[in-house]
Amino acid sequence: GHGNSPAPEDLQYYSPAAYGLQFEIIRKALGVEKWFVCGYSLGAGLTFRYAYDYADHVIGHIFTNSNSALADEAQILDWKNTASKSSENIRLGGIAAIEKIPVHPRRARTLPTHIYDALMQDAAKFSPVGVANTLLATNPNTCIRDIAPHNPRPVLLCAGDKERRFKTNKLWALEHIANLECVSFDAGHGVNMEASEGFNIAVTQFIQSLV
């Protein structure tokens, strides 16, 4: 449902497993046997699980602050209990309802102006169907805590330490995720945008260390 991405009506396309299949289609279309994947926020849980399910095709993976990927049982239960109502609100309210979501880009006022403006242009293209289906089938099922101790490939967490609600999840990640390297930044949730130069350096060094 983001930007020009497709937003099918069929709910089956929004599961983490379905995303993994799409990543494989992209990999094969690129003609590469092994690659690196990087996930931001909600996408982090999707790329992390892909790296677990398709480890033979992943050299390493990177992720940023993700409270959905590292959600505890209480948070997951809350999302599951509220998913239907939240999804229906988006379908009925459209773009106006999407703009009320706490993580909408319009609230990311600390971003550099040119990045903020680009995000807002993209946000105007949000698909209510895509966002509604994401709330139903993606967000409540993205947690990777069950597979984290068995993560088979090197993984880099680029953590924005200004995001207070991620602190507990970061500590959990450091304690439980196998093969984890972590680099911390003086940034918030959007670490790759707020600290782009440092983020690029960290990711480049991580990739170079594995190839």
What are the language-model segments listed below?
Residues 1-3, 68, 188-191:
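Alpha/beta-hydrolase active-site loop signature
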Residues 39-43, 47:
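Gly/Ala-rich beta-loop-alpha elbow adjacent to hydrolase catalytic centers
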